[in-house]
Amino acid sequence: MLNFLENHDEQRIASDFFAGDPRKGVPALIVSACMNTNPMMIYFGQEFGEMGMDSEGFSGRDGRTTIFDYWSVDTIRRWRNEGKFDGKMLTEEQKHLYAIYQRVLTLCNEEQAISNGVFFDLMYANENGWRFNEHKQYTFMRKYKNELLFIVVNFDNQPVNVAINVPSHAFDFLQIPQFDSYKAVDLLTDKVEEISLLPY
């Protein structure tokens, strides 16, 4: 099954009718792209923060991008740059968002735990958590052979520090040793830190 966040039927993430800010879609992008091995569709300018706020033809100004009318959208025109396809006309914010999309989608192809691995949901072990709000954060694990990914996303507008419970069943299911310390690499920032995995 195809995963997606935007299509011609849905209001754009960045539109005034939905989130109003394309950066608010990044946590959902990470979850949708990394949760399973399914393909991820990026829709016509989504990676640049297309707002879909033009008043175009059949549908009018509704936060969507028409597929029924002969139309072009601002972000794609900027990315095309009069046929150079170099993105030089994109704003700095659009370039930054594009870099995030490129990084996440590249990880989906490079990381075997995402493209071929098993999934373990951690949400059931983190309801009413001491330092985890199940309404604002989401977490799961992916594993393939010796590669383990611990994915945590924050849907809140504020940065947070979280503590995540890993149930003992996860260690059995994923065949990972308990009470070990690991060198963890943040795949979006390349920051390295030591973490300990203790069963809950």
List each model region and its residues.
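Conserved catalytic core of Hanks-type protein kinase domains
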Residues: 7, 35, 107
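Residue-level detector of alpha-helix boundaries and kinks
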Residues: 17, 30, 86-90
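Active-site clefts of carbohydrate-active enzymes
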Residues: 1-20
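Short, glycine/acidic-rich beta->alpha junctions
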Residues: 20-26, 132
